[in-house]
Amino acid sequence: LALYFAGIMMVLLSTVTNLSNVSRLFQVLLPFSFNFLDQTLNLFVGFLLLGLARGISMKVKKAYWPTIILLGFCIVNTVARTTSWQLIAVYAVILLAVILARKEFYREKFVYSWGALTVDSILFGCLFIGYAVAGYYAARPAGGNQVINHFLLFPSDDVWFNGLIGLSISLIGLFFLYQYLAETTVTLGEGFEEARLTRFLEKFGGNEGSQFLYLKDYGHFYYQEEGEDQVLFGFQMKFNKCFVLADPIGQREKWTAATLAFMDQADLLGYQLVFYRISEEYVMNLHDCGFEFMKVGEEGLIQFEIGRAHV
């Protein structure tokens, strides 16, 4: 939350440069926010803080050191321009909190969820719209409408244009930051290996969804013991969700251990497992593993009687 606050404050104060002069709330909050002399640097650092806050909230290991370095840079820059021991104490607490939480960061990569993507899209979309509106009124003052002028006008068109450049650079930097956080050599499960899959199905048999596992857009997670494949899951990836098709294939007595191993590996990479088209027996197994479940649709069986055709 502290990182989100710092990032949003820096972006807001750089986007609407006189915001602290027209709002008592921001007059109170301004002394507790990072602030640089350069508007472009304010925007750039603000967006990086927002991006790292997202990574920290998802407990991504690779977000830890960039956050420490960026916070240290912000603190040194700000403290060099202030003598407020109260402010220094607040910054020290924020930095200490991140350091003490370092063991909480265990995920190998950053993966966007639908919810996080929606929130960030709304945040950045509102920022762009607000900046465009501010630029419009900066170029065409709103006549006698002192309220609009008071809130949205920049000191000059140059200030607005410099901010626009900073905004563009910041979004590019944010894109590369997300790319960095999302890169990893660790993968979930295995790719399509026809010989291995066929050998496994011949040994343990299949289920109602096993024919789909030969489609190359499915991934395969093999649970092994002593180097031998024991249980198989077939899945597809959608954002941060891993949709697992039907019951596991393999030794039933090892389903629970295999499911827990699959959960741990998926969580390590930032994915959440979603099971569908599964049996009642496996539903209870998943419930014991901590999953919630809901029933959608019904399964029906029809017996067709063979007889003379009717015209």
In which residue ranges do the predicted regions lie?
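Charged, low-complexity surface segments at secondary-structure and domain boundaries
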Residues: 182-188, 300-307
